[in-house]
Amino acid sequence: MTEHGLRRYMKSTAVRKLTVPVLQILLDKVAEFTAHVGPDSYFSVCLYEYFAFAKIRSRNEEATAFNNRGDWVGISLIPSWTKPEYDGFARDWVHSTVDALADAERKDDPTEEGVVGKRGYGNGSDGLEKVTQVFGANYPRLRKIKKKYDPELLFRKWFPIVPAED
């Protein structure tokens, strides 16, 4: 799935169900990407991840650091290309695709009734977005713990929690 010189950008999101509107968005967006980039997009991937969430949902959101307690279908978008001139387009394409999926979910259920936690996925998010989506409402509590046990930020990789201020 890789070769020398291949450029990639990855971002993940999640939906509650793979509905026809969601699949149509993905089909249209992939067609848009391949039409723009052409044959150079042949290693692009759209992954659907299904996990059993019953055990995860058996604990409430505040019981652990991670806030995601919902039933989700993970979607990882990994466009590929080789020409640097497509870098900006690819990044914008990924973000607009994630936004379109979120919009479709809101149209399907504007109240998001029954949604527990966030749909963020730490391995495919950027910076502070990653931290706040992964920890959600637990982030302020984790900042206090960080202040007490690691104020010097010795452990600052992966999900860098900023210690609470005085």
Label the predicted regions.
Residues 1-166:
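Soluble FAD-dependent oxygen oxidases
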